[in-house]
């Protein structure tokens, strides 16, 4: 199963021999993976009782031969008993060959995966459900058995499955009883890494009787979070020691956080940016929503850590000489320009050799020594030539950078003083139209915007999509979570109640993304008759006579992508195009027209619902909340505020002149620490009529 070169050299010979023993199993067993679905034929071939017995015997012999005092390195620098090697493979074999009701469970899980997430997967031999099969469902005995085995295993993702009680939740919801989890453990070695001596890069401080976490951080000039992190202490000063010493390493200029202070207020008062504040205090989360839990602690308002010393002076001469060298008595004729270095030519020298020796170009060498001809045939031995200019050679007379200016200090200035010049003016660009205002909470820096009026389709016209929000997100190719955040929707895009307010603009893409149109433009060649538009390209037989929407296949299309683009299901596509094989491998051709809508099912998809107006009789009424709300808010609430990025419970109460207690009384769903149910885009009550 394993090779000699893969084992450590320091293993005892008996242990190595046991590990290298032959195990009579199919060759597929050696490379088994727990995250792979194997075909039934492969399972029949390798899942034999003989192989199971051989693996069990191999594990037992390795445990006996290697003992408890031998270890091999594993992940995360842990040392484990060598028995982990055969035991891991034995577990993978048992998981792969798991059976329920005399059937392999792997193919059942593969079929369930196809129904849950259809498409080609590198871990799945199925790309779509075979015809005539049904979804096994999450309560299938095989699905439960596989989850039960994972929950009791110490290998792979077993500890995660156990910690999240996934199997217990499944058995509870599916009514499965009498099948508890059986837990196994890994044979880890008792040897542990040698502890490293703690070192402090700063100064040691001895804790006094009157000290606490907050007083030490203030007195020592260190942020509270840095003090805790540098000493391996619990967050929020929990279980802070009352004796011993502390390492004070990351000193900085500090400020104490006040009640209900915000990141913006702290940064402004310190003369720094919010970005700097978060960079120097990594305990602050990206949106500063946890600053309200830090009152009384100290934060850094300058870079933490030791200051680098200022650079000192150096005696190294400048790279470019700034003073001329004395002119030698044997200087060549014409070599009379300022020169920082001279070279006395020796017999056998020639121009190319000299310029290579002193890293100077031939043009510069001839410029500094004009007595040499263009062919460089009159370079004389025993004479000195200039091989380096003083400063930049381009500032010499006759070079491109040379400027000669003569200034008369007694001349009278005749121009217009700079202070008397008129201020520059810029004429703004006039837009040919006035864009609609941004809807409440929508980002102001998006690349593409759209009007809420464009997505007011009734449910029967949405087709595949669950809401107008999901339709817009798909048209702009946006991730669901990002789309919700850009537009402060307050609910998932797949929620049928998710919608846009007419008259406002919404963010379609924050970065450059390809915008897909809502409806396809009909080809110019299509004509309308009694049976619907004439197909714009050749068609197959069997397509419905009342088809009124067509799609011509282009490069990159698939049955699924055509159905998705048209807002129909895959089954509808195949029902309306029966010539196409269910796996899309036959009769799906480039340039061919396929039916994606019929008159009795689709309706007029090109019609965009226009905003309607209705008259309302004036009368006393309370204001409608400007965003989604929580339960428990008072019925007589007449003032609302929608949470934006950077808001806290304290800042919301302060900006609306109410107390924090009033805020929590009127919004009982929000936890008192402002952690639970305080959401961006949600409306909260900040005033009542009574």
UniProtKB/Swiss-Prot annotation:
Pfam families according to UniProt: LysM (PF01476)
Phenotype of null mutants: Does not affect virulence on Arabidopsis, N.benthamiana and tomato.
Alphabetized SMART domains for the sequence: LysM (SM00257)
Domain of life, per lineage: Eukaryota
Compositionally biased residues, Low complexity: 606-619
InterPro entries for the chain: LysM1-like (IPR052210), LysM_dom (IPR018392), LysM_dom_sf (IPR036779)
Note: In plants, chitin acts as a microbe-associated molecular pattern (MAMP) that is recognized by lysin motif (LysM)-containing plant cell surface-localized pattern recognition receptors (PRRs) that activate a plethora of downstream immune responses.
Matching PANTHER family: AM15 (PTHR34997), PEPTIDOGLYCAN-BINDING LYSIN DOMAIN (PTHR34997:SF1)
Free-text note regarding domains: The LysM (lysin motif) domains are small globular domains involved in binding chitin in eukaryotes. Vd5LysM contains 5 LysM domains.
Family: Belongs to the secreted LysM effector family.
Protein's recorded name: Secreted LysM effector Vd5LysM
Species this protein is from: Verticillium dahliae (strain VdLs.17 / ATCC MYA-4575 / FGSC 10137) (Verticillium wilt)
Gene from which this protein is expressed: Vd5LysM
């Amino acid at each position: 199963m394993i090779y000699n070169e893969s084992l450590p050299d320091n293993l005892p010979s008996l242990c190595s021999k046991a590990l290298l023993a032959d195990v009579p199993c199919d060759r597929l067993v050696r490379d088994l993976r727990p995250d792979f679905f194997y075909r039934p034929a492969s399972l029949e071939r390798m899942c034999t009782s003989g192989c199971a017995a051989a693996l069990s015997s191999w594990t037992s012999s390795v445990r006996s031969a290697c003992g408890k005092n031998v270890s091999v390195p594993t992940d995360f620098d842990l040392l484990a008993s060598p028995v982990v090697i055969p035991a891991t493979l034995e577990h993978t074999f048992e998981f792969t060959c798991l059976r329920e009701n005399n059937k392999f469970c792997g193919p059942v899980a593969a079929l369930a995966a196809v129904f849950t997430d259809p498409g080609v997967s590198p871990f799945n031999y199925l790309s779509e459900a075979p015809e005539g099969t049904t979804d096994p469902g999450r309560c299938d005995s095989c699905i439960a058995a596989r989850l039960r085995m994972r929950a009791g295993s110490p290998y792979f993702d077993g500890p995660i499955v156990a910690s999240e009680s996934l199997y217990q939740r499944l058995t509870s919801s599916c009514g499965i009883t009498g099948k508890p989890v059986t837990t196994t453990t890994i044979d880890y070695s008792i040897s542990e890494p040698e502890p490293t001596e703690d070192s402090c890069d700063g100064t040691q401080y001895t804790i006094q009787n009157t000290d606490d976490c907050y007083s030490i951080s203030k007195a020592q000039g260190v942020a509270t979070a840095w003090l805790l992190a540098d000493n391996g202490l619990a967050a929020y000063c929990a279980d802070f020691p009352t004796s011993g010493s502390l390492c004070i390493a990351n000193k900085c200029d500090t400020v104490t956080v006040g009640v209900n202070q915000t990141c913006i207020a702290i940064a402004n008062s310190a003369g720094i940016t919010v970005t700097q504040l978060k960079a120097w205090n990594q305990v602050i989360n990206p949106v500063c929503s946890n600053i309200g839990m830090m009152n009384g602690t100290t934060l850094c308002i300058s870079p933490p850590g030791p200051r680098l010393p200022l650079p000192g002076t150096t005696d190294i001469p400048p790279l470019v000489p700034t003073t001329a060298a004395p002119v030698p008595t044997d200087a060549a004729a014409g070599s009379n320009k300022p020169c920082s270095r001279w070279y006395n030519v020796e017999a056998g020298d020639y121009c190319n050799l000299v310029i290579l020796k002193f890293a100077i170009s031939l043009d510069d060498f001839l410029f500094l020594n004009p007595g040499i001809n263009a062919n460089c045939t009159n370079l004389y031995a025993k004479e000195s030539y200039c091989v380096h200019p003083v400063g930049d050679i381009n500032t010499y007379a006759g070079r491109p950078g040379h400027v000669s200016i003569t200034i008369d200090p007694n001349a009278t200035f005749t121009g217009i003083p700079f202070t008397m010049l008129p201020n520059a003016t810029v004429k703004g660009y006039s837009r040919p139209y006035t864009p609609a205002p941004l809807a409440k909470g929508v980002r102001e820096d998006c690349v593409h915007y759209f009007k809420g009026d464009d997505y007011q389709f009734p449910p029967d016209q949405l087709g595949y999509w669950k809401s107008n929000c999901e339709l817009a997100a798909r048209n702009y190719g946006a991730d669901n979570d990002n789309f919700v955040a850009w537009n402060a929707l307050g609910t998932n895009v797949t929620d049928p109640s998710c919608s846009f307010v007419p008259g406002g603009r919404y963010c379609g893409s924050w970065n450059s993304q390809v915008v897909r149109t809502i409806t396809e433009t009909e080809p110019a060649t299509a004509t309308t008759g009694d049976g619907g538009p004439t197909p714009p390209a050749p068609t197959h037989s069997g397509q419905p006579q009342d088809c009124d929407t067509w799609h011509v296949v282009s490069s990159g299309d698939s049955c699924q992508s055509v159905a998705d683009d048209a807002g129909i299901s895959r089954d509808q596509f195949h029902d309306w195009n029966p010539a196409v094989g269910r796996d899309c491998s036959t009769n799906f051709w480039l340039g061919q027209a396929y039916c994606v809508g019929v008159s009795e099912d689709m309706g007029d998809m090109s019609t965009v619902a226009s905003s309607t107006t209705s008259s309302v009789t004036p009368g006393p009424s309370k204001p409608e909340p400007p965003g989604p709300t929580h339960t428990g808010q008072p019925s007589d609430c007449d003032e609302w505020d929608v949470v934006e990025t950077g808001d806290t419970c304290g800042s919301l109460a302060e900006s609306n002149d109410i107390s924090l207690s009033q805020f929590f009384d009127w919004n009982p769903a929000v936890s008192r620490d402002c952690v639970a149910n305080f959401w961006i885009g949600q409306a909260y009550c900040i005033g009542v009529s009574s």
